[in-house]
C-alpha cells in the first residue's frame, strides 16, 4: 500500500474488512518504527493516528538524532552506548533525513564542563557510542574555539570540545519510516481515533473501535493484538482497559525558538550551559535561521497544543545573550517557536531534567501491550523490543511464526542512495538529471537532499503537473502534490508544518503561499466550503501560536 490521501476510502475499507495480527495506536516515530518492524517480519499490520502523523511529540523535538552526551553526565552509561549505536543505524538507513553536524562545547571558568572532565567525557562518549574515527572528539584552545564560533562569550573562556551530533528532520524521519511500513503492506491511516478496545469472551483485547475524525464515521478494526504507542496519550488510551498497572507518565515540556541569522549570525552548532540553572541547551544553524532549545518544565495542560509562554521565550533569550553577549537578541527577533511534550515515566521526587528517558513495555492481563517513554534516536530498538514480545505472544497464543528483526540494515523510504558515503554523489547525479526536466539546479539539490531516492517522483510531477495555474513556485507545488499522493497529507497544516517544516524554518513562505496551498488542496481533495474555512482557520491559528505563543499555564485550571 502507498500512503496516498487519494486512497483513504480504500484503506478504510480494508481496515474494516481485515483481521490483523496487530493494530497499533499512535502515529509518531514509536508507532511508525513498530509498524515497520512488524510488517517487515511478515505480520499483517494496521496503524491509526488520531491527528496527523508526528503531530504530537515527533515533530516537536530538538531535531537531533544524538548519542546522548547529557546522559554521560548522569552516569547513564548504557543509554549512551545504545543511543550511539542506534544513531549510526538511523543515519545509514536514511542519510536524506539525517546529517552529521559538528557541535562545539565551550568551556568557561566555573561552567558545567571543565577541560579535563570534558576531554575524558568526550573520549568515553566516543568509545561507548562507537563513534567512527573521522568523527571523534577534538579538544580546542580558547582561540580555536573562537575561530569556530566568534560569537561565543570570551569572558572566562578556557577552550572547547568539538564532537559530532546528527541533525534530523523528526517529522520527515517519521513519515519516511511510515512510508516504508506501508510499502511492506501495513495499512495506515491518520485522523482516525481509537475510542474503545473490543474484547473476546475471555476478556482479551481483540481490536479497537475507531472514529474517523474527518467524516465522523465509527467502525471496528479486528486484530489478534493491540499495541498502545500513543506517546503523551499512553495513559488515556490504556485507561479504557480494565487491566492497567500502577505505572504512569510524567509529562515535561520543551520549547525552541527560531531567529533569523541576520539577527543571530550563528555559524556553528553550539551546546552550552545556561546561567540561570546550568541546564545544557543547543543553538543550531539551519537554512538561514538559528534555532535554540530546549526548556524542561513539568506540564499537565492540553496535550494536543502545548504552547510557548513568555516565560519560555525569556528563558531562551537570556540563555542566548549570556553565551553570545554581542548579539543582543530581543523578543521581537523571534520569528517562530515550537513546544513539545516529553512522555516520561514518572519517577517521584526528581526534577524534569533528572527523569530518565528510558522506555518500558507494559503488558496487561487483557493482552494489551503498551510502550512508554523513550527517545527519537532509539525508535528502531524500541520497536525491536516490543515486536519481539509481540511475536512471542502470537506464537504462544496462535501458533504463528515470524522472522527475526531485520531493520538494522533496512533502508527507510527514500534511503536507497548507495549508503551514507555515496549520498553527496547521489545528490549531484540527481541535480544533473533534473536539467532534463528544466528544474533549477538549487531547487533540484534541495529536493534530492530532502527526498533521497524518492526524488524522481517529484521530478516527474514537475514535468506533468500544471503548477503555473496554482500561483505556487514549482518547488512548493511539487512537494505539495507529492505529499498528497504519497504522504497522506489531508489538511494544509499537515504540509505547511510537518511535511515541509516551513512554519518553523521559513514562516515567510507560509504567509506568502498559504492561500495558494489551500486552493490546490481544496481542488485535489474536494474540500467542502465548510472544510476549507475550518482548515484555513487552522493555518491562521498555527501561525499565531508559532509567532506569539500564549500565556498557557503548566496545569489545567
Swiss-Prot record:
Pathway, per record: Polyol metabolism; glycerol degradation via glycerol kinase pathway; glycerone phosphate from sn-glycerol 3-phosphate (aerobic route): step 1/1
EC number of this enzyme: 1.1.5.3
Binding residue positions for FAD: 21-49
Top-rank EC class of the record's enzyme: oxidoreductase
Sorted UniProt keywords: Cytoplasm, FAD, Flavoprotein, Glycerol metabolism, Oxidoreductase
Cofactor(s) essential for the protein: FAD
Superkingdom classification of source: Bacteria
Pfam families on file: DAO, DAO_C
Main location (coarse class): cytoplasm
Family per similarity comment: Belongs to the FAD-dependent glycerol-3-phosphate dehydrogenase family.
Protein name from the UniProt record: Aerobic glycerol-3-phosphate dehydrogenase
Biological classification of the source: Bacteria, Bacillati, Bacillota, Bacilli, Bacillales
Amino acid at each position: 500500500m502507498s500512503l496516498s490521501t487519494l486512497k483513504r476510502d480504500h484503506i478504510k475499507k480494508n481496515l474494516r474488512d481485515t483481521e490483523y495480527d496487530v493494530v497499533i495506536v499512535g502515529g509518531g516515530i514509536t508507532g511508525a518504527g513498530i509498524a515497520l518492524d512488524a510488517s517487515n517480519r511478515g505480520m499483517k499490520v494496521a496503524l491509526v493516528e488520531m491527528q496527523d502523523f508526528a503531530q504530537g511529540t515527533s515533530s516537536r523535538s530538538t531535531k537531533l538524532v544524538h548519542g546522548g552526551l547529557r546522559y554521560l553526565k548522569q552516569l547513564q552509561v548504557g543509554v549512551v552506548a545504545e543511543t550511539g549505536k542506534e544513531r549510526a543505524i538511523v543515519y545509514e538507513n536514511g542519510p536524506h533525513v539525517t546529517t552529521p553536524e559538528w557541535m562545539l562545547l565551550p568551556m568557561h571558568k566555573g561552567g558545567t564542563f571543565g577541560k579535563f572532565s570534558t576531554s575524558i567525557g568526550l573520549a568515553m562518549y566516543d568509545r561507548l557510542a562507537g563513534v567512527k574515527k573521522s568523527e571523534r572528539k577534538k579538544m580546542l584552545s580558547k582561540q580555536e574555539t573562537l575561530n569556530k564560533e566568534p560569537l561565543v562569550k570570551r569572558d572566562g573562556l578556557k577552550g572547547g570540545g568539538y564532537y559530532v551530533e546528527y541533525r534530523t528532520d523528526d517529522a520527515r524521519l517519521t513519515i519516511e519510516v511510515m512510508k516504508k511500513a506501508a510499502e511492506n503492506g501495513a495499512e495506515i491511516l491518520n485522523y482516525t481515533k481509537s475510542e474503545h478496545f473490543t474484547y473476546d469472551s475471555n476478556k482479551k483485547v481483540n481490536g479497537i473501535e475507531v472514529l474517523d475524525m474527518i467524516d465522523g464515521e465509527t467502525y471496528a478494526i479486528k486484530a489478534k493484538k493491540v499495541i498502545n504507542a500513543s506517546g503523551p496519550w499512553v495513559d488515556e488510551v490504556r485507561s479504557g482497559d480494565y487491566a492497567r498497572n500502577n505505572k504512569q507518565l510524567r509529562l515535561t515540556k520543551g520549547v525552541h525558538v527560531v531567529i533569523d541569522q541576520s539577527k543571530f549570525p550563528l555559524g556553528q552548532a553550539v551546546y552550552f550551559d545556561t546561567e540561570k540553572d546550568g541546564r545544557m541547551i543547543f543553538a543550531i544553524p539551519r537554512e538561514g535561521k538559528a534555532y535554540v532549545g530546549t526548556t524542561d518544565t513539568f506540564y499537565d495542560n492540553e496535550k494536543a497544543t502545548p504552547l510557548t509562554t513568555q516565560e519560555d521565550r525569556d528563558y531562551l533569550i537570556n540563555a542566548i545573550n549570556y553565551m553570545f553577549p554581542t548579539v543582543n537578541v530581543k523578543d521581537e527577533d523571534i520569528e517562530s517557536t515550537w513546544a513539545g511534550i516529553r512522555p516520561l515515566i514518572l519517577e517521584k521526587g526528581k526534577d524534569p531534567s533528572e527523569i530518565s528517558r528510558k522506555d518500558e513495555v507494559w503488558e496487561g492481563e487483557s493482552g494489551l501491550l503498551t510502550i512508554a517513554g523513550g527517545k527519537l534516536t532509539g525508535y528502531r530498538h524500541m520497536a525491536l523490543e516490543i515486536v519481539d514480545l509481540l511475536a512471542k505472544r502470537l506464537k504462544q497464543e496462535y501458533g504463528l511464526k515470524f522472522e527475526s528483526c531485520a531493520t538494522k540494515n533496512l533502508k527507510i523510504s527514500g534511503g536507497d542512495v548507495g549508503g551514507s558515503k555515496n549520498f553527496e554523489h547521489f545528490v549531484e547525479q540527481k541535480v544533473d538529471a533534473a536539467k532534463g526536466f528544466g528544474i533549477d539546479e538549487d531547487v533540484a539539490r534541495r529536493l534530492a537532499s530532502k527526498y533521497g531516492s524518492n526524488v524522481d517522483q517529484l521530478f516527474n510531477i514537475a514535468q506533468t503537473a500544471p503548477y503555473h495555474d496554482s500561483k505556487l513556485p514549482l518547488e512548493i507545488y511539487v512537494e505539495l502534490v507529492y505529499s498528497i499522493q504519497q504522504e497522506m497529507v489531508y489538511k494544509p497544516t499537515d504540509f505547511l508544518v510537518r511535511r515541509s517544516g516551513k512554519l518553523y524554518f521559513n514562516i515567510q513562505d507560509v504567509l506568502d503561499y498559504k492561500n495558494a496551498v489551500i486552493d490546490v488542496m481544496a481542488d485535489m481533495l474536494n474540500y467542502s466550503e465548510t472544510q476549507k474555512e475550518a482548515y484555513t482557520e487552522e493555518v491562521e491559528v498555527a501561525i499565531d501560536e508559532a509567532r506569539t505563543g500564549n500565556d498557557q499555564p503548566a496545569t489545567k485550571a
